[in-house]
Curated annotation (Swiss-Prot):
InterPro entries: Bacterial_rp_bL28 (IPR050096), Ribosomal_bL28 (IPR026569), Ribosomal_bL28/bL31-like_sf (IPR034704), Ribosomal_bL28_bact-type (IPR001383), Ribosomal_bL28_sf (IPR037147). It comes from Mesoplasma florum (strain ATCC 33453 / NBRC 100688 / NCTC 11704 / L1) (Acholeplasma florum). One of its GO terms (biological process) is translation. The gene is rpmB. One of its GO terms (cellular component) is ribonucleoprotein complex. This is Large ribosomal subunit protein bL28.
Length: 66
């Protein structure tokens, strides 16, 4: 499975790592993905991968199952 937030669709960012001499090498900034269980309106429980930022929002909306 891709390193992608299943709700927002966010994925890793790419860019350059810069040394002191400003040499550029490619690198990625990965998301802080967490597996959480969420409940829909019908009471069904699903396990999804979301970023830490999305997890904060879900907890605020009381969607996350403990």
């Amino acid at each position: 499975m891709a390193r992608k937030d299943m709700l927002t669709g966010k994925s890793a960012l790419s860019g350059n790592s810069r040394s002191h001499a400003l040499n550029a090498t490619k690198r990625k900034w990965n998301l802080n993905l967490q597996k959480v269980k969420v409940m829909d309106e019908n009471g069904n429980v699903f396990t999804i991968k979301v970023s830490a930022r999305t997890l904060r929002t879900l907890k605020k909306q009381n969607v996350v199952v403990a």
